[in-house]
Amino acid sequence: MRDRRASYEYEDLLACGRGELFGPGNAQLPLPPMLMFDRIAEISETGGEHGKGLIRAELEVKPDLWFFGCHFKGDPVMPGCLGLDAMWQLVGFFLGWSGGIGPGRALGLGELKFSGQVQPNIKKVVYTIDIKRVMRSKLWLGIADGTLAADGEIFYRAKDLKVGLFKQTAAAQPAE
């Protein structure tokens, strides 16, 4: 049975990271510290710019977040790749939430533009993912556009984020 709520809190995201939300062997979020948002405030199959799905997630930015201490010493900034990874995480979550089977993997993107930096003085990051297409076959493939807004200002724009869910073969199953 899939969990199809319209929003998810932090404990739910951790359950997803443990493989408990969509079932064993299916889409999972990474666990902290690589989980890059605190909640999914909204998820739907019909919303968004293209009418094919919308996800809105939030991260409360705190000066003691793990990456500020090492990237960079004396000039703390969230690595851009982490914001991008959050967008891929959300597309994968959407595929699992939509009924897709198998573990997810980021497959690429068409274009990415940065116009700002997430620094410790930022209070909140909001990720918005607009689903453009979901292909359902042996491979479930999600294609989406995404933004990262910091305190209401868009800093990242990604086009054609691609994530796939792959049915595991016996050879790909983890050893017990």
From Swiss-Prot:
Active-site residues per Swiss-Prot or TrEMBL entry: H71
EC number: 4.2.1.59, 5.3.3.14
Cellular localization per UniProt: Cytoplasm
GO molecular function annotation: (3R)-hydroxyacyl-[acyl-carrier-protein] dehydratase activity; trans-2-decenoyl-acyl-carrier-protein isomerase activity
Biological processes, Gene Ontology terms: unsaturated fatty acid biosynthetic process
Major localisation: cytoplasm
Entry GO terms, CC: cytoplasm
Pathway: Lipid metabolism; fatty acid biosynthesis
Subunit structure: Homodimer.
Family: Belongs to the thioester dehydratase family. FabA subfamily.
Protein name (Swiss-Prot/TrEMBL): 3-hydroxydecanoyl-[acyl-carrier-protein] dehydratase
Lineage: Bacteria, Pseudomonadati, Pseudomonadota, Alphaproteobacteria, Hyphomicrobiales
Gene: fabA
